[in-house]
Design a protein with these regions (language model features):
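C-terminal non-catalytic regions of proteins with extracellular/luminal or membrane-system context
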Residues: 6, 12-13, 20-294
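Structural signature of the thiamine diphosphate
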Residues: 1-3
């Protein structure tokens, strides 16, 4: 209560005046270093196809950065381009490259593959400790694991997201045979178990868990999550993993009139007390001013 901002009412958040002010700030913060041949602004009458590529193009976390509140709506770069382009311009998207390795995850989530106790989705137990100990004071059911909470948010029955752990369980029925990738993203961290074991894991900053599945077989899925403090999030996705192929990417966008690349750094690499340990980064701090090798 020492400063007037401490008594700001919730009704002020995202009010029309503030939204307009934030938009103007965003517009005036852009620095155009080069505009060769007057390319910008784009003329929708002359552009038939736009290719949007890069690891930051369709990533909500990249829009939020490191220290953030929770807007009611988040628009990624890809979504913004599609909105501005309208129906008259074709917009295609390829991730193309990852931040620091050559793995590319392609989401192909199928909610019909996950069920428990006769219900689609996951059972979940929450604990007010970081060790999954004792009797869970709050249990629930999620059709999908995809949560984002502010610091100290109550998830239910008095359990808050500070010094909290949770475990989701389900049975996964493989839709086909072959390699299936489960991507786990979490703040602070989460680990996936399949049939009681941690499966093969790939990726330097992304957690890609690999299952060599047999069509029709059922696998026990368990996701264990821990959150100590600050903002929290956890998400489970499924799809397939492939290696980046620059030549294939170039061929796939060769007919585009405009190519927009969204890459560089990311809050998935830089932050405070992170688990990232890769060349150029140590626990969220930079050890080099060079861009990642990719």
């Amino acid at each position: 209560n020492r400063v007037p901002y401490a008594s700001t009412p919730l009704s002020v958040l995202e009010c029309a005046e503030h939204l307009e002010h934030a938009l103007q700030m965003a517009r005036e913060s852009i620095v155009l270093l080069k505009n060769e041949n007057g390319l910008l602004p784009l003329d929708k009458k002359k552009v038939r196809k736009i290719a949007v590529i890069g690891p930051n193009a369709d990533d909500e976390k990249g829009m939020l950065a490191n220290y953030y509140g929770f807007p009611s709506e988040i628009s990624t770069i890809l979504e913004g381009v599609r909105q501005k382009a309208g129906e008259s311009v074709e917009v295609v998207y390829h991730k193309g490259v990852n931040h620091v390795d050559n793995w590319l995850f392609n989401s192909d989530y199928d909610e019909d593959c996950f069920s428990i106790n006769g219900k689609k989705g996951f059972s979940v137990e929450y604990f007010q400790n970081t060790r999954w100990e004792g009797v869970s004071p709050y249990t629930s059911h999620d059709e999908r694991i995809d949560h984002r909470w502010g610091n100290g948010t109550e998830v239910g029955n008095g359990v808050i997201t500070n010094d909290m752990s949770a475990v989701w369980r389900s049975q996964f029925k493989a839709p086909g045979s072959g390699e299936i990738c489960f991507e786990v993203s979490a703040d602070d961290y989460a680990t996936l178990f399949i049939d009681g074991k941690i499966p093969e894991k790939r990726g330097l900053i992304n957690n890609y868990y690999i299952l060599n599945a047999k069509k029709g077989r059922t696998y026990d899925i368990e996701l264990r999550y821990v959150q100590h403090g600050d903002n929290a999030d956890v998400k489970l996705d499924m799809g397939y993993l492939e290696s980046a192929d620059p030549q294939k990417l170039a061929e796939s966008v060769s007919d585009a009139d405009v190519i927009i690349f969204a890459g560089g750094l990311s809050p998935r690499l830089e932050g405070e007390e992170m688990a990232v340990q890769i060349d150029g980064f140590r626990r969220g701090d930079r050890t080099s001013i060079d861009l990642p090798a990719v």
